Amino acid sequence: MAKPTEIPGLEPGTPLSVAGPLLVRARLDDVRRYEAAAVGTGEGEPDVDAVHDMRIASRRLRAALQLFGRGDLAALEDEVKALQDALGEVRDGQVQRRWFERHARKQDGGGRLAAWAGGGLPRASKRLRRAIRGWQGAVAPSIARAAEDAAGKGRLQGKRLAKEVRARLATLKRRLAAARDARSPRKVHRLRIAAKKLRYVAELVEPGFPGAAKGMLAALVPLQERLGDLHDTDVRIERLERLARRGQRRERRAARATLAVLHEERAREARALRRELSRWREERVVRALRRGFSRGGRRVKLRVKVAAAANGHAADAPAA
């Protein structure tokens, strides 16, 4: 996953009236970087990596609009969400097809399932090309013009941004508790979304809270990896269960055989997630992270042992 563009000169004392427009423009440029590759050539399928990176960049742009947007700029977030959704439709199809292609080597019928998983990609790719044309023609230029409105009172290390981070942490804490047994795909997915949103905000406020934000990003890496693995498996199970009921005879047989493998895989991934959630509770990770954004925004050294560091993870690990 590509890192967000760094902006030289931003520091804890930088006014939001300066930092806000710079961060919004940087996040906008990050999205635009992938336009050509994500459109593809002719009627062909878009580049897999470009779709992935552009989707993440669009999420980061939405986070910037939520944090700094006002007036017309804030209203453009829905347009960015529409682009993100079009990218997500293609990305999900590509991810699922790739898994079934690999699985096809191990089990009869896997090739048939790979074709089924990628069956919607031509239509999704067409919708994505249409969405990118709209983005290029109207949405991106509008964000560029309105970026100057991304202001607000205070500094990068001020109370306002610290409060925003604490609010995201509170949401994460609630969803950690709700998903603690890792049984419900819906609750796991909601936790995954909360972790993503917290990550993208932490990236934005890192120049103001460098120590606290780096600790937060590192702590989120192993959690997001476990959540991502389990979510992808849950999506496969849901779709295959539907195919096992409604597909053609050979498809139903292949789907049932693959479902047995997937349920075993989900059990392993759920155990791994439960271990990570248990670690967060035992080490009071949320409480430790919150301290870095408390006391009026002053830096506080985190006392949490970050598993990401112990396992050799980097804070920029995939968070798709």
Q: Where do the model's predicted regions map?
A:
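Function-determining surface determinants
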Residues: 1-320
